[in-house]
């Protein structure tokens, strides 16, 4: 209560607040401001006199100039991004022109060259450094280093050589224990030799710091490269984006070995046995089919045939299971090498427009082989390996009936002793009509291609075949059985095609077509037209390479 009273009495005794003082008159304020301004001016720099203002006509619109520091800079030219070349590496057991035992070498040499002509690709190839590689090339190989390659429990020396040809970089894997031997194949330890080769390929990529976009492996000898990529190297970051393609050149040769050596010799863990096991053994071709992103064959027809037990040599279930990633691309030939207009091995040169030189080639071939020089007599030629699937049993059955006509027969090749002996005996019994040369020589083969009139190729199976293309290129009309690449490259005369064909594997069907071809041969105008058709058929790699480009680019998009 006391506190309340004192508070109220204080409120009563409180004086009202004082009113604000009146402002000074305006004159006094102006005077005070003038004094302050004069004091400031005394300490400042003297001010420049104000410019005299003159009345002028209305000025034009004033151009506003940005400060110098804000002047717009000239835009730099847009940066042109150069697309990095796609990197392609071919892995194979042979390559032309260094060493060749068959069509595989031609494919590696010619396909790589065709792709390298496109500036979009960095194309390289790798093969073993065999003892028999041609000295004319080997002397220029450049040694670029060596590594030690892990092969299961051991490390093996690997030398690396390099050679550039036709814009393709070739690498050669050197190990004298494995490769300093005559020839390429046929040794008891071929499995170990090519396991070392494939493991070396994968290690060399790291040594070169070259990780291809496409790893293209060919036949069973290179199959382990695709298998190693899937089972060992895909876990390394540099290898993760490599895409593997596997090409079957001949499904008959699959690389089959005992399961016991999977880990001890090949260095592959048994947990991956399911990838390579087939019919209770290691099957390297099966393993490559399972491990690659795409697999191909060397002709569209052969791609269909290998799904059939008749052609697949037991592998058709694997092919059918993986057919979603299978395609067939027809091989080609090198038009620069196989060119009758420039080929120095020929007795005379010619082309599709002027075939006079071919008549000279025929006459000189007859002289060289000690055959009667008879321009009107057709020469039927075979250049082949002497093995059963080349249709030689058909030839044996009807050749003597064909020889009753006015023809000459020339054979060049080596192979099974049974066929070598048969054709050698045939030449002895038909002297002046038959010549059998049991050997092989590239220059001689081109002399025969150019000097013969008809080329006989009645194969039981033929994944692609190059001989029928080469013969056609030289104006020698082909007779083929409709199988594999023969069907894809030679079309029947009766349908306006570039050769003669028969469907069933039957000797008398073949004899009928031989007689048909001989009949057309004696109609010179019609034969000349058929020769022109054969010589102008496009068998070049340029066309085939386009299909491979499409395959590669499709893989890289996924």
Region spans (language model):
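N-terminal intrinsically disordered, low-complexity tails
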Residues: 9-68
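Catalytic cores of nucleotide-sugar-dependent glycosyltransferases that transfer UDP/GDP/TDP-activated
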Residues: 2-15, 19, 23, 61-558
């Amino acid at each position: 209560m006391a506190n309340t009273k004192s508070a109220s009495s204080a409120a009563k005794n409180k004086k009202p607040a004082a009113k604000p003082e009146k402002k000074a008159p305006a004159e006094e304020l102006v005077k005070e401001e003038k004094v302050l301004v004069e004091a400031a001016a005394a300490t400042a720099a003297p001010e420049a006199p104000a410019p005299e203002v003159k009345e002028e006509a209305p000025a034009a619109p004033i151009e506003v100039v940005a400060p110098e520091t804000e002047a717009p800079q000239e835009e730099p030219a847009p940066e042109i991004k150069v697309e990095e070349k796609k990197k392609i590496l071919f892995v194979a057991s042979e390559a032309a022109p260094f060493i060749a035992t068959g069509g595989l070498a031609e494919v590696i040499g010619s396909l790589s060259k065709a792709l390298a002509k496109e500036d979009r690709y960095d194309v390289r190839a790798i093969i073993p450094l065999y003892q028999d590689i041609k000295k004319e090339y080997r002397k220029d190989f450049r040694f670029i280093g060596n590594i030690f390659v892990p092969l299961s429990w051991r490390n093996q020396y690997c030398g690396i050589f390099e050679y550039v040809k036709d814009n393709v970089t070739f690498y050669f894997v050197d190990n004298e224990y494995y490769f300093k031997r005559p020839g390429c194949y046929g040794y008891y330890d071929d499995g170990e030799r090519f396991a070392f080769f494939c493991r070396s390929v994968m290690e060399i990529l790291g040594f070169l710091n070259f990780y291809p976009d496409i790893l293209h492996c060919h036949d069973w000898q290179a199959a382990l490269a695709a298998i190693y990529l899937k089972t060992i190297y895909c876990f390394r970051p540099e290898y993760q984006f490599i895409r593997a393609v596997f090409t079957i050149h001949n499904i008959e040769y699959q690389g089959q070995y005992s399961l016991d050596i999977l880990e001890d010799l090949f260095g592959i863990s048994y947990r991956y046995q399911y990838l390579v096991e087939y019919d209770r053994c290691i099957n390297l071709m099966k393993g490559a089919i399972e491990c690659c992103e795409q697999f191909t064959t060397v002709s569209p027809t052969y791609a269909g045939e290998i799904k059939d037990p008749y052609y697949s040599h037991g592998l058709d279930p694997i092919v059918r299971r993986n057919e979603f990633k299978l395609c067939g691309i027809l091989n080609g030939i090198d038009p620069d090498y196989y060119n009758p207009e420039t080929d120095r091995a020929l007795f005379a040169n010619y082309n599709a427009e002027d075939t006079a030189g071919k008549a000279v080639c025929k006459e000189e071939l007859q002289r060289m082989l000690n055959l009667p020089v008879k321009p009107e007599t057709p020469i039927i030629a075979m250049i082949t390996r002497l093995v059963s699937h080349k249709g030689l049993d058909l030839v044996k059955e009807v050749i003597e009936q064909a020889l009753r006509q006015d023809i000459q027969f020339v054979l060049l090749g080596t192979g099974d002793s049974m066929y070598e002996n048969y054709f050698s005996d045939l030449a002895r019994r038909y002297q002046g009509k038959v010549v059998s040369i049991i050997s092989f020589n590239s220059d001689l083969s081109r002399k025969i291609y150019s000097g013969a009139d008809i080329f006989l190729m009645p194969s039981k199976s033929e994944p692609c075949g190059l001989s029928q293309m080469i013969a056609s290129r030289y104006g020698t009309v082909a007779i083929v059985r409709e199988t594999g690449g023969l069907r894809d490259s030679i079309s029947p005369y009766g349908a306006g095609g570039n050769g003669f064909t028969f469907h069933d594997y039957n000797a008398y069907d073949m004899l009928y077509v031989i007689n048909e071809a001989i009949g057309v041969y004696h109609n010179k105008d019609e034969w000349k037209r058929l020769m022109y058709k054969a010589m102008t058929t496009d068998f070049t790699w340029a066309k085939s390479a386009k299909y491979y480009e499409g395959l590669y680019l499709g893989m890289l998009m996924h």
